[in-house]
């Protein structure tokens, strides 16, 4: 009981700290937006100040009649600091009286001084105007439109009733949420299995707040026209041949990319994990390189090499080959090269966790190597294969950066959605097209679950083999390694183009060697680089731990709403970045949760967006672990936290590492959703790279892409050192 009480207190202290951070972020952002709106009103009204005493009097009278939002008083002669007024103010009587009485105070003196220098000033505290509530006071210069001289000062008073009402609602909301949360946590901790109940409550709260609610806002927007409910947007989309063609184009692209990426990813994972092939470190490095680079860097490299004026395209034309990289073939190529690491990272953990005693038994019973592979190894890898295919498929559907540059005549929904949002400024159409992408994603999701649920894939039983069995002959191993080296050479060629761009003065125009790009790029990107690393470092451990907890609950626990929770957790991966960005802007730019413009909304976006990768990897690994291991630990008195920390997490270590790695690199290289969520205070390096590329500053873009790759590779090394190898799972090829 004492231990549970201590855990409860510690949990609530953590909740208080996190809640206070969220509370202050919401409060400060609301006040910032409110005061910015008031300042814009002051600027607009002050810009209309007329010339002549009669005109000023009439203008003040008109303002008093037309506006209930603010009061205005005019001070004809600006006093010196600390002195009283020499002329009576005009305008609102109560505000004029306050101005006359308070003119010599430090706050009003500072306001008059700012007005004299043609600047707008807001007092640091609110003032009581007449018998009304406290109001916010602004000072602005009264500039004659003809002479452009400052004729006096304008004093504005804004009601703070709205701000105070919002603060009361915010305080009530947070206090009520805290009390409710405390009661729920207490009940869960005092229950028989409190940790599981608490985890389920947290996951449901997280998905409802940051998945269901934003999607509802986006869905609601797709049914609105001119502020009223309408089916017009959906009728236009479903009756448009162009939009339906884009849907078919997305499906074709997704299927081809997912198939080729899964094959390439499995080839890399199998050679690295299950053979004694040479250069494994090089293969592993090249196997993750594409996923850690900006999503458009490979596309730019391919265009520079194989575009209409590419280096290789010119050579092909010399020998009479008419070749174009634009369209479906080019997109499949660039997406496969960019997305096969998703399959590689997922399948590596699965193949490493397969207990090789089954393969040894098969070989001892005179089965051939290929028969053992096809009957034992491959079926046991099916969960990982399906998970990898699903993840790549949804990634391909949601991709817009590559189609933006390489689509050619091919229409895809993600690109059409992006164009609707950024080019046509039709948020409803963009949201509707993005929502349409959920149909094929959910279909693939349900098909995968239905297939996998009918099979058993338990291989880790608590007595793992200390080695793995070589299933390939030397000839086959050389053949597989040869294919990989061809792919590796192609990737090196692509990234060599990026590296070469760092030292070229202006790619495509002036190929003179220069170091100016490096100096300029690093100087202009310091703040954005620090912001990106900070936000990614915060999101990575959160996403990794939450993913493993969610996977454990989905695989090991039975509870009401399990399928709903699983669907909500997996949905973000299917969403185009534009939809996720739009959804978050729509959902979190007003009460009760205002996060737009803060670092929190970017971190939350990272966690929610990349969570499905870790969950899929965790599910695939947990299906290979015999539940009796955890049951034995529980029978010996271990609680759920100990079981998770000491038993489950070490056994799913490969999947956990993959989740951490993938979250960090995707956070560092995100662009589609982040481009909507960045602010002047929190910028992102990939957006800066994209801006440089868009402005044809390929040298600067190449430098930042190279720096980004170096940072992420360094993070990979640190992550490997922090999470040590589990000696029980170490395997050596024999």
Give the location of each predicted region.
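Extreme N-terminal signal-anchor transmembrane helix of membrane signaling/transducer proteins, especially
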Residues: 1-25, 175-177, 182-186
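Membrane-proximal extracytoplasmic alpha-helices
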Residues: 21-55, 59-66, 158
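Extracytoplasmic/periplasmic sensor domains and loops in membrane signaling proteins
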Residues: 57, 85-133
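Short N-terminal helix-loop-first-beta-strand/juxtamembrane motif that initiates sensory/input modules
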Residues: 60-88, 177
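A short, hydrophobic, proline-anchored segment that marks a local hinge/packing element in signaling
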Residues: 136-148, 290, 572
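Helix-start (N-cap) segments at beta->loop->alpha junctions
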Residues: 155-172
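Membrane-water interface segments at the C-terminal ends of transmembrane alpha-helices
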Residues: 195-227, 240-352, 380-400, 432-449, ...
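Glycine-rich helix-loop "coupling/hinge" segments at transmembrane-helix boundaries
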Residues: 304, 399-425, 510, 671-698, ...
């Amino acid at each position: 009981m004492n231990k549970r009480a201590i855990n409860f207190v510690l949990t609530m202290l953590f909740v208080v700290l996190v809640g206070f951070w969220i509370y202050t972020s919401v409060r400060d952002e609301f006040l910032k937006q409110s005061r910015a709106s008031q300042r814009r009103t002051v600027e607009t009204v002050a810009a209309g100040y007329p010339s002549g005493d009669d005109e000023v009097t009439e203008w003040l009278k008109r303002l008093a009649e037309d506006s209930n939002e603010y009061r205005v008083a005019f001070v004809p002669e600006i006093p010196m600091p600390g002195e009283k007024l020499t002329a009576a103010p005009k305008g609102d009587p109560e505000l004029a009286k306050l101005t006359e009485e308070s003119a010599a105070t430090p706050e009003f003196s500072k306001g008059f001084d700012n007005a004299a220098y043609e600047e707008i000033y807001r007092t640091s505290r609110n003032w009581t105007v007449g018998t009304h509530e406290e109001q916010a006071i602004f000072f602005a210069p009264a500039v004659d439109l003809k002479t452009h001289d400052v004729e006096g000062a304008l004093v504005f008073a804004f009601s703070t009733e709205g701000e105070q009402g919002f603060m009361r609602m915010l305080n009530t909301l947070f206090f009520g949420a805290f009390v409710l949360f405390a009661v729920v946590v207490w009940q869960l901790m005092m229950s028989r299995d409190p940790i599981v109940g608490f985890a389920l409550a947290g996951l449901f709260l997280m998905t409802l707040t940051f998945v269901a609610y934003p999607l509802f806002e986006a869905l609601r927007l797709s049914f609105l026209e001119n502020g009223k409910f309408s089916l017009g947007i959906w009728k236009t989309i479903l009756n448009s041949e162009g939009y339906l063609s884009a849907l078919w184009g997305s499906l074709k692209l997704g299927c081809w990319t997912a198939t080729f990426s899964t094959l390439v990813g499995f080839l890399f994972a199998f050679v690295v994990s299950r053979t004694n092939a040479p250069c494994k470190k090089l293969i592993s490095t090249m196997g993750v390189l594409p996923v850690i680079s900006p999503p458009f860097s490979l596309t730019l490299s391919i265009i520079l090499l194989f575009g209409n004026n590419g280096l290789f395209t010119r050579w092909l034309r010399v020998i009479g080959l008419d070749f174009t990289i634009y369209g479906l073939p080019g997109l499949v190529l660039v997406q496969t090269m960019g997305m096969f690491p998703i399959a590689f990272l997922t399948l590596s953990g699965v193949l490493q966790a397969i207990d090789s005693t089954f393969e040894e038994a098969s070989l001892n019973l005179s089965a051939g190597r290929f028969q053992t592979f096809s009957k034992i190894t491959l079926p046991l890898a099916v969960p990982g294969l399906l998970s990898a295919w699903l993840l790549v498929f949804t990634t391909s559907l949601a991709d817009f950066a590559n189609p933006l540059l390489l689509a050619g005549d091919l229409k895809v929904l993600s690109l059409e959605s992006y164009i609707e949002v950024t080019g046509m400024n039709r948020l409803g159409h963009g949201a509707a097209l993005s929502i349409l992408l959920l149909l094929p994603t959910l279909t693939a999701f349900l098909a995968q679950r239905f297939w996998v649920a009918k099979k058993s894939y338990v291989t880790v039983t608590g007595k793992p083999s200390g080695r793995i069995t070589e299933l390939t002959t030397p000839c086959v191993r050389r053949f597989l390694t040869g294919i990989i080296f061809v792919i590796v050479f192609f990737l090196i060629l692509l990234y060599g183009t990026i590296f070469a761009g760092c030292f070229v003065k202006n790619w495509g125009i002036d190929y003179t060697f220069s170091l100016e790009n490096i100096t300029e790029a690093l100087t202009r990107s310091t703040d954005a680089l620090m912001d990106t690393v900070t936000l990614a470092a915060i999101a990575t451990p959160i996403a990794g731990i939450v993913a493993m907890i969610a996977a454990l609950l989905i695989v090991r626990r039975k509870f009401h709403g399990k399928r709903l929770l699983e669907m909500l957790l997996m949905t973000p991966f299917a969403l185009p970045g534009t939809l996720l960005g739009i959804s978050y802007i729509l959902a979190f730019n007003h009460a009760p949760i205002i996060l737009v413009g803060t670092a929190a909304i970017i971190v939350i976006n990272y966690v929610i967006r990349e969570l499905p990768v870790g969950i899929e990897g965790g599910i695939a690994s947990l299906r290979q672990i015999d539940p009796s291991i955890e049951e034995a630990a529980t029978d010996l008195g271990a609680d759920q936290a100990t079981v998770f920390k000491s038993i489950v997490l070490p056994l799913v270590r490969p999947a956990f590492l993959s989740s951490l790695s993938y979250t960090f690199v995707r956070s560092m290289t995100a662009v589609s959703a982040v481009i909507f969520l960045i602010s002047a205070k929190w910028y992102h390096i990939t957006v800066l790279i994209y801006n440089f590329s868009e402005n044809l500053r390929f040298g600067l873009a190449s430098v930042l892409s190279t720096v980004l790759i170096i940072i992420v590779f360094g993070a990979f090394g640190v992550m490997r050192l922090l999470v040590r190898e589990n000696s029980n799972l170490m395997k050596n090829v024999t």
